[in-house]
Swiss-Prot record:
Keywords: Cytoplasm, Methyltransferase, S-adenosyl-L-methionine, Transferase, tRNA processing. Its main location: cytoplasm. One of its GO terms (molecular function) is tRNA (guanine(37)-N1)-methyltransferase activity. Its EC number is 2.1.1.228. This is tRNA (guanine-N(1)-)-methyltransferase. The gene is trmD.
Length: 247
């Protein structure tokens, strides 16, 4: 899968994808991440990419011409690219977004800087994404996050293909609690069921933990989650136990 990034700071992308899982994926050729300097498509002696805003105001605004030239060039190289704009005004990025984007052949990220970007740039992209209700100094960190979230879903990137299936949000719920050795640490014990070897009981406990943790921490997710009748029965019982102080 190809990831192309339009940015004024291409050096930011070297380190995050040099190591760990994504670093290995790059070395194996499963993903290709290329950060392009937007100034390469700017014209004139000074290769200006931003200018003062019409109507006055603070900061500088990213000009539309370099972005338009860059996107035309990149789309010629990879005609099936989907272009994403990183902006606080975009739709919230979530695990379902990552799953959908992982089905694309190529993604292009447009990273804003300074005060923002010329409104006409919006007409050049396919989607606008935001990481949340906060503002970063630029779109680069958002692009890195989305590349990581999407890239790990590319076939072959994760060593165990079932790993992504059990992640938080993979089925609309938070992940169950995880434990490893030792069985007891500073008085805190691993739940007996995980040491029992009873796979059916372990699976049921893990599902209960998913439901309970989601209800306690992100109840909004339950409204959208696809729950079975058994899930609903377990959730009602967990809620009853919590209300009666049995938990």
């Amino acid at each position: 899968m190809f990831f192309d990034v339009l940015t004024l700071f291409p050096g930011m992308f070297a380190s995050p994808f040099a190591d760990s899982i994504m670093g290995k994926a790059v070395k194996r050729g499963l993903v290709q991440i290329t950060a392009h300097h937007l100034r390469d498509w700017a014209e004139g002696k000074h290769q200006i990419t931003d200018d003062v805003p019409y109507g006055g105001g603070e900061g500088m605004v990213l000009k539309p011409e370099p972005v338009a030239r860059a996107l035309r060039d990149l789309r010629q190289r990879r005609p099936h690219s989907r272009v994403l704009l990183m902006t606080p005004q975009g739709k919230p990025f979530c695990q379902e977004s990552a799953r959908q984007l992982a089905g694309e052949e190529s993604l292009v990220f447009v990273c804003g800087r300074y005060e923002g970007f010329d409104e006409r740039i919006r007409s050049m992209v396919d989607d606008e994404f935001s990481l949340g209700d906060f503002v970063l100094t630029g779109g680069e960190l958002a692009a890195m996050t989305i590349i990581d979230a999407v890239g790990r879903l590319v076939p072959g990137v994760l060593g165990n293909r079932d790993s992504a299936a059990s992640d938080s949000y993979s089925d609309g719920l938070l992940e169950y609690a995880q434990y490893t050795r030792p069985a007891e640490f500073e008085g805190m014990k691993v739940p007996d069921v995980l040491l029992s070897g009873n796979h059916a009981a372990i699976a049921r406990w893990r599902r209960q933990q998913q439901l309970l943790r989601t209800w306690l921490r992100r109840p909004d997710l339950l409204e959208r989650a696809c729950l079975s009748d058994e899930d609903r029965r377990m959730l009602q019982e967990l809620q009853r136990q919590a209300d009666s102080g049995e938990q």
